[in-house]
């Protein structure tokens, strides 16, 4: 469920087909995310998952898997989200 939500947010932010977004997709090289897109994406993630992502952390995200792992580590009720 978390990966699908990330796919949805990226697809919406970049106006691309979510089926082109894979766990290993590089945010810049494969998806073409620039700094403005990244901020928009993170705002969606923060609001949906009720997280705060620092600018330093944002800079560390290289691929979709990095975002997924961060969410899994920081969401309070991860098990509940997976069952939704």
Curated annotation (Swiss-Prot):
<dbReference type="GO" id="GO:0005829">
    <property type="term" value="C:cytosol"/>
</dbReference>
<comment type="pathway">
    <text>Lipid metabolism; fatty acid biosynthesis.</text>
</comment>
<keyword id="KW-0443">Lipid metabolism</keyword>
<keyword id="KW-0597">Phosphoprotein</keyword>
<keyword id="KW-0596">Phosphopantetheine</keyword>
<keyword id="KW-0444">Lipid biosynthesis</keyword>
<dbReference type="Pfam" id="PF00550">
    <property type="entry name" value="PP-binding"/>
</dbReference>
<comment type="similarity">
    <text>Belongs to the acyl carrier protein (ACP) family.</text>
</comment>
<dbReference type="GO" id="GO:0016020">
    <property type="term" value="C:membrane"/>
</dbReference>
<keyword id="KW-0276">Fatty acid metabolism</keyword>
<dbReference type="InterPro" id="IPR003231">
    <property type="entry name" value="ACP"/>
</dbReference>
<dbReference type="GO" id="GO:0000035">
    <property type="term" value="F:acyl binding"/>
</dbReference>
<keyword id="KW-0275">Fatty acid biosynthesis</keyword>
<dbReference type="InterPro" id="IPR036736">
    <property type="entry name" value="ACP-like_sf"/>
</dbReference>
<keyword id="KW-0963">Cytoplasm</keyword>
<dbReference type="InterPro" id="IPR009081">
    <property type="entry name" value="PP-bd_ACP"/>
</dbReference>
<feature type="domain" description="Carrier">
    <location>
        <begin position="1"/>
        <end position="75"/>
    </location>
</feature>
<comment type="function">
    <text>Carrier of the growing fatty acid chain in fatty acid biosynthesis.</text>
</comment>
<dbReference type="GO" id="GO:0000036">
    <property type="term" value="F:acyl carrier activity"/>
</dbReference>
<feature type="modified residue" description="O-(pantetheine 4'-phosphoryl)serine">
    <location>
        <position position="35"/>
    </location>
</feature>
<protein>
    <recommendedName>
        <fullName>Acyl carrier protein</fullName>
    </recommendedName>
</protein>
<dbReference type="GO" id="GO:0009245">
    <property type="term" value="P:lipid A biosynthetic process"/>
</dbReference>
């Amino acid at each position: 469920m978390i990966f699908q939500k990330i796919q949805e947010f990226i697809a919406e932010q970049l106006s691309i087909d979510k089926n082109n977004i894979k766990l290993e997709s590089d945010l810049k090289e494969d998806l073409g995310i620039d700094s403005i897109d990244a901020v928009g994406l993170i705002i969606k993630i923060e609001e949906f998952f009720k997280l705060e992502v620092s600018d330093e952390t944002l800079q560390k995200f290289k691929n979709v898997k990095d975002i997924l792992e961060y969410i899994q580590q920081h969401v309070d009720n991860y098990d509940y989200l997976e069952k939704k």
